[in-house]
Structures are given as C-alpha cells and as structure tokens.
C-alpha cells in the first residue's frame, strides 16, 4: 500500500476553480462524469470499494484512514478491473459486507504530476481534491490556486458529510445504504451545520 497524499478544499465554485486551473496551466483530462460505487465494510477506519469511473475504467480499492488530520493519514491500494458487476461479486464472494451504493460527479485536471478533482456529491457543496506525489507538490498547487493550507481537510468523503451535518461517520458509512442524486436525503442530511 502507498500513502494517498491528498487534501480536500470544501465549498468551491466550479467555474472559479476551472478559471484558476486554466490560469496556472492545468489541463482538463476528463470532463465531468457520473461515477458509481459500492463500498464494503473492512473494519474500523478502512473500506474497500468497486468504482465505475466512467469511460470504461473500473477500479477496486482498499483504503485505510489512520489520521483524518494529516495529509499522510490515508493509505490505499488500487486495482483496475474490466467489469463493475464482477468486481462487486468478487467483494461479496470474499465475505465483505456492503456498506453503501453511492454516486458522485467528478471532473479531473492535471497540473504536472498533480491531479485535481472537482467532486460533486449528493447533499453537500462541491469540493476539490488535490493529490500529488509529495506533500510539497500538493501544497504548492494549492497555493498557486489561491487555496489556504489551514482550510484543507483530509480523509474520506464520510468526514466531509460529518463536517457539514455533524453526523457520526458510522451513520454515513454503515447506516446509509444509498447516497444517490435522485433520492430524498435521509433524516440526518436535512439540516446542514456549515
């Protein structure tokens, strides 16, 4: 497994971020696409998933989040596969319990070796993830984009829901079987804190 060196910046304006990305010389490598995923329970602070990233790319991932306060707090391993349904069946066959079926929209940009993703999830404002080969690369890119290090968040999207709604991550992870755009939000997602 390797460290996922990534920082999130919440509540962004897509048009302003796209403009800033163009200004610094980043290029859009994948237009906004609907992604769908099944997430599986693998124990405390970790999960596995099968994600259809659009354009025929299917990825199975295992993540362990040991520290949601650190840019180096997440380790992951990814395997590209050729069939979404078979990936889900594989996880089930290994005895993993499904946590949730989820969807989001993602647009991907590159700035050198740094990947910038504009992510939109149900019931929360759009945010970006900046992922790079080193902490320095992530922070340099954020600075060029006018983003402040002290505003960065870390961890998985469940911690983003926790930030906006004050709900325990286990409620998002273990007790919300679907997070989809075409559904009414669950009770916990009806009153935002931020």
Where are the regions that the model predicts?
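A hydrophobic, small-residue-rich beta->alpha segment in the mid-to-C-terminal subdomain
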Residues: 135, 141-150
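N-terminal strand-loop-strand beta-hairpin
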Residues: 1-116, 148-194
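Short histidine-centered beta-strand/loop micro-motifs
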Residues: 119-120
């Amino acid at each position: 497994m390797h460290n996922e060196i990534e920082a999130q910046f919440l509540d962004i304006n897509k048009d302003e971020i796209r403009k800033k990305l163009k200004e610094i010389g980043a290029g859009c490598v994948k237009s906004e696409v609907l992604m769908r995923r099944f997430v599986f329970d693998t124990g405390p602070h970790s999960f596995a998933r099968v994600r259809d990233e659009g354009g025929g790319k299917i990825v199975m991932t295992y993540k362990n989040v040991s520290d949601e306060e650190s840019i180096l707090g997440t380790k992951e391993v990814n395997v590209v596969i050729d069939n979404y349904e078979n990936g889900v069946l594989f996880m089930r066959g290994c005895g993993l319990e499904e946590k949730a079926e989820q969807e989001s929209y993602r647009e991907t940009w590159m700035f050198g070796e740094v990947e910038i993703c504009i992510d939109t999830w149900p019931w929360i404002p759009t945010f970006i993830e900046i992922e790079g080969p080193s902490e320095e690369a992530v922070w340099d890119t954020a600075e060029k984009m006018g983003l402040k290090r002290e505003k960065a968040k870390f961890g998985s999207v469940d911690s983003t829901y926790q930030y906006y709604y004050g709900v325990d991550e286990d409620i998002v992870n273990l007790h919300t079987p679907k997070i989809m755009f075409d559904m009414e939000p669950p009770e916990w997602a009806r009153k935002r804190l931020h």
